[in-house]
């Protein structure tokens, strides 16, 4: 296997237990978007596994009937199993165990010739999972690096920019490196060996449940436990609970015990809930008010009505139509499903399945015995479901394993080694002598090197305008009454720590307040939400983001999906979706691989990864001199590159290092014949390049589809109106 292929941490979660009987005989159903591999026979599973990990030739999977015995013997030797050559119970158990997705090798191994040429390694946490609080994720990664720093002369410094040696990213499905994740319990994580570009980076599948290895981590608020996390399971009035509950209370506020036995210890806290606080919006973090009025209708729970992005929200007064005050409802991680076809939704109890009512998660209907729930009240009619939270995977252990790969280590055949390909949870110091021998073979022994300043900042960038999230000052009064008392009033509002960034935009109709971020640069002629984009002569910027064409103008934007019958969405406040941005933009661009979104205004650039922003950064940092006053647009190329345009010139731009090649600058007409040299919006849409000037666009089809804009001049194939032909205005 080429060392340039990423190391895929694959979870083959095919349980061997059968579902509990529903009637006399268990009834099994096909769940929408479920893993098909769960229906494989043992032999089919073994054949697929042996082929995937290099033990059999591709010809055997093409229909040639050959014995599996030689391949099984190799597998058993590699995994230190009894070498029977048979598909016995121990071998099947190993096949069903979480593991990395690369062919296995012998005792401690390193990627030949691949190691860092310096011992002061930098890393950047590009984005976060919502499964754990950010400080816990930061701590898990720091501890994972420290494992290797304890036994080798290596230091690890966290930085806040893409110049880092190791870029850490959470992603789902196709996340930008050409090696997509496949949802819950498939590929768990992967990393690349040392080197430039994507080499050395570590990616984690955000469809998994990340924990400390012992179940979901739920921080608590108020109560009498000083913010200690929930302890699952816990006992209350003799009954065991594996999630937050409202039992024992008459105000509907979910709570949990922070020890194993509430009946004995009496320690508790309140779980994240809209009854305690809301996130973002314009309600100043106040809790939801139920019921509330929206568009003349009464709501007694959080809703997604009026939104196109699926985020749950509520009013923070009794009447949204009158007061226009709202916030977003906190996520209930303990009750949020993973996988299935409703990832991120909440379990709905009770729900109906095969005519029977369920008030808790069940394994009925499944051959693998895994717990699941419906996310609507009736699975039989809606077919919406997901897996209930399980113990999750230790982010610390998986990260320590992946960072071993990022430092140059391959897999070990020693079962006790951290670099052994099969995942297992363990406590204490995770390194085995085999791991230590491997890392010291690469980097030697001895004390840590003297620290040297990294090439990028080691302090987290601060927002350029006051944040819009709710205040972090604790309330003056904390409820300390235990859950059995059942007070009639809700706990005092206000979380004790900053909430994570929230969703975008306001419920329809949108708030009338101007943007609160970047307000110093806002246009003096603010666009009215009622204005029709078909009346806009020239847009500030146009870009394809998340499959939708975005049209920006004076701090607002519209979204257009090119689907038959799909309505134009918006207007939305730009500052609600991307709070750090100014009101006026010059251009925007989404990296098709990493899904990072680049924004340009004047001589500044912002880069959004999900809800995390880097910037503003000066164009000087990109290698562009003062003569470049703005960026007109970017077009993607292969291998993490793009073309960057300004004033009739074009540069080659590296999307990871965020640097232009100063030797690459040429005139636009050398690559694109017939387009306006002074185009103000340049973007790619549906694999074609668009150059806009005034009300018109010039569309270019690439002549060289393999290398896009290499070697051949690309010709204009259409000229049209932005509003009539792109926005499809009447």
From Swiss-Prot:
<dbReference type="InterPro" id="IPR024079">
    <property type="entry name" value="MetalloPept_cat_dom_sf"/>
</dbReference>
<keyword id="KW-0378">Hydrolase</keyword>
<feature type="short sequence motif" description="Cysteine switch">
    <location>
        <begin position="98"/>
        <end position="105"/>
    </location>
</feature>
<dbReference type="InterPro" id="IPR001818">
    <property type="entry name" value="Pept_M10_metallopeptidase"/>
</dbReference>
<dbReference type="GO" id="GO:0001501">
    <property type="term" value="P:skeletal system development"/>
</dbReference>
<keyword id="KW-0272">Extracellular matrix</keyword>
<keyword id="KW-0177">Collagen degradation</keyword>
<dbReference type="InterPro" id="IPR000562">
    <property type="entry name" value="FN_type2_dom"/>
</dbReference>
<dbReference type="Pfam" id="PF00413">
    <property type="entry name" value="Peptidase_M10"/>
</dbReference>
<protein>
    <recommendedName>
        <fullName>Matrix metalloproteinase-9</fullName>
        <ecNumber>3.4.24.35</ecNumber>
    </recommendedName>
</protein>
<dbReference type="GO" id="GO:0006915">
    <property type="term" value="P:apoptotic process"/>
</dbReference>
<feature type="binding site">
    <location>
        <position position="177"/>
    </location>
    <ligand>
        <name>Zn(2+) 1</name>
    </ligand>
</feature>
<keyword id="KW-0479">Metal-binding</keyword>
<dbReference type="GO" id="GO:0045742">
    <property type="term" value="P:positive regulation of epidermal growth factor receptor signaling pathway"/>
</dbReference>
<feature type="compositionally biased region" description="Pro residues">
    <location>
        <begin position="490"/>
        <end position="514"/>
    </location>
</feature>
<feature type="compositionally biased region" description="Pro residues">
    <location>
        <begin position="463"/>
        <end position="477"/>
    </location>
</feature>
<dbReference type="GO" id="GO:0035987">
    <property type="term" value="P:endodermal cell differentiation"/>
</dbReference>
<feature type="repeat" description="Hemopexin 4">
    <location>
        <begin position="676"/>
        <end position="729"/>
    </location>
</feature>
<feature type="binding site">
    <location>
        <position position="183"/>
    </location>
    <ligand>
        <name>Ca(2+) 3</name>
    </ligand>
</feature>
<comment type="function">
    <text>Matrix metalloproteinase that plays an essential role in local proteolysis of the extracellular matrix and in leukocyte migration. Could play a role in bone osteoclastic resorption. Cleaves KiSS1 at a Gly-|-Leu bond. Cleaves NINJ1 to generate the Secreted ninjurin-1 form. Cleaves type IV and type V collagen into large C-terminal three quarter fragments and shorter N-terminal one quarter fragments. Degrades fibronectin but not laminin or Pz-peptide.</text>
</comment>
<feature type="region of interest" description="Disordered">
    <location>
        <begin position="442"/>
        <end position="529"/>
    </location>
</feature>
<dbReference type="InterPro" id="IPR033739">
    <property type="entry name" value="M10A_MMP"/>
</dbReference>
<feature type="propeptide" description="Activation peptide">
    <location>
        <begin position="20"/>
        <end position="107"/>
    </location>
</feature>
<dbReference type="GO" id="GO:0006508">
    <property type="term" value="P:proteolysis"/>
</dbReference>
<dbReference type="Pfam" id="PF04886">
    <property type="entry name" value="PT"/>
</dbReference>
<dbReference type="InterPro" id="IPR036365">
    <property type="entry name" value="PGBD-like_sf"/>
</dbReference>
<feature type="binding site">
    <location>
        <position position="405"/>
    </location>
    <ligand>
        <name>Zn(2+) 2</name>
    </ligand>
</feature>
<dbReference type="InterPro" id="IPR018486">
    <property type="entry name" value="Hemopexin_CS"/>
</dbReference>
<feature type="domain" description="Fibronectin type-II 3">
    <location>
        <begin position="342"/>
        <end position="390"/>
    </location>
</feature>
<comment type="similarity">
    <text>Belongs to the peptidase M10A family.</text>
</comment>
<feature type="compositionally biased region" description="Low complexity">
    <location>
        <begin position="478"/>
        <end position="489"/>
    </location>
</feature>
<dbReference type="GO" id="GO:0007566">
    <property type="term" value="P:embryo implantation"/>
</dbReference>
<dbReference type="Pfam" id="PF00040">
    <property type="entry name" value="fn2"/>
</dbReference>
<feature type="repeat" description="Hemopexin 2">
    <location>
        <begin position="582"/>
        <end position="626"/>
    </location>
</feature>
<feature type="binding site" description="in inhibited form">
    <location>
        <position position="100"/>
    </location>
    <ligand>
        <name>Zn(2+) 2</name>
    </ligand>
</feature>
<feature type="binding site">
    <location>
        <position position="199"/>
    </location>
    <ligand>
        <name>Ca(2+) 2</name>
    </ligand>
</feature>
<feature type="disulfide bond">
    <location>
        <begin position="244"/>
        <end position="271"/>
    </location>
</feature>
<feature type="active site">
    <location>
        <position position="402"/>
    </location>
</feature>
<feature type="binding site">
    <location>
        <position position="187"/>
    </location>
    <ligand>
        <name>Ca(2+) 3</name>
    </ligand>
</feature>
<feature type="repeat" description="Hemopexin 3">
    <location>
        <begin position="628"/>
        <end position="675"/>
    </location>
</feature>
<keyword id="KW-0645">Protease</keyword>
<dbReference type="GO" id="GO:0062023">
    <property type="term" value="C:collagen-containing extracellular matrix"/>
</dbReference>
